[in-house]
Amino acid sequence: MKFFIDTANLDEIRSAAELGVLDGVTTNPSLIAKIVGDPSNFTYGDFKEHIRRICEIVDGPVSAEVTCLKAEEMIAQGEDLAAIHENVVVKCPLTIDGLKAIKHFSASGIRTNATLVFSPNQALLAAKAGADYVSPFVGRLDDISTDGMELVEQIVTIYDNYGYPTEVIVASVRHPQHVVTAAMMGADIATIPYSVIKQLANHPLTDAGLTKFMDDAAVMKK
């Protein structure tokens, strides 16, 4: 299983990369907004420069999302984003216009990530249109009392049934169990907030054992 980090924070990306477990990055407009003090002073050029800086840190796919709704506009912006760096993957929402853009990018050799996916039908359409990645948002489904991980299982089964090469990125991850369950289901990738990446390393018995070892080591003769 591959681990992506779901953030636009450069310090978090660097810290995750230092752990040796980072395979890529996903961003979206909301994550970009979190790191911008005053959005009115953050230009599209600033956005592209920020994506470029992320690509310099991580040697892997970096998803950058389009910020328009019409297919023609998505295509124009997506081509511009893809030109930033060879690792850029263009994120398109799973809409009718998004599918048109994904089809265009697939034919042009530009990698895509179909995002805001909440149903197996949407995931099937994404694969047929040629998306390289599909991002089911499990946490947001859990928020409305729906089993987000059941959707992941359905998508993995459908893709396995027909041999679709589209990789499943489990997104909107809220806690370590999302990651573990995704791995058990055979999802290709989990994109994880930095806080959850750190939680994956924690266990109370590890802490207790370390405390005991250090206490015992302290009484040993130097």
UniProtKB/Swiss-Prot annotation:
The protein's matches in Pfam families, at most eight in alphabetical order, are given as: TAL_FSA
Please provide the Gene Ontology terms (biological process) for this protein: carbohydrate metabolic process; pentose-phosphate shunt
The entry's active site is K91 (schiff-base intermediate with substrate)
Q: Does the keyword Cytoplasm apply?
A: yes
Major location category of this protein: cytoplasm
User: What broad class of enzyme is this?
Assistant: transferase
Protein name from the UniProt record: Probable transaldolase
Q: Which domain of life is it from?
A: Bacteria
Pathway listed: Carbohydrate degradation; pentose phosphate pathway; D-glyceraldehyde 3-phosphate and beta-D-fructose 6-phosphate from D-ribose 5-phosphate and D-xylulose 5-phosphate (non-oxidative stage): step 2/3
Q: What's the source species for this entry?
A: Chlorobium limicola (strain DSM 245 / NBRC 103803 / 6330)
| Record field: catalytic activity | D-sedoheptulose 7-phosphate + D-glyceraldehyde 3-phosphate = D-erythrose 4-phosphate + beta-D-fructose 6-phosphate
Q: What is its EC number?
A: 2.2.1.2
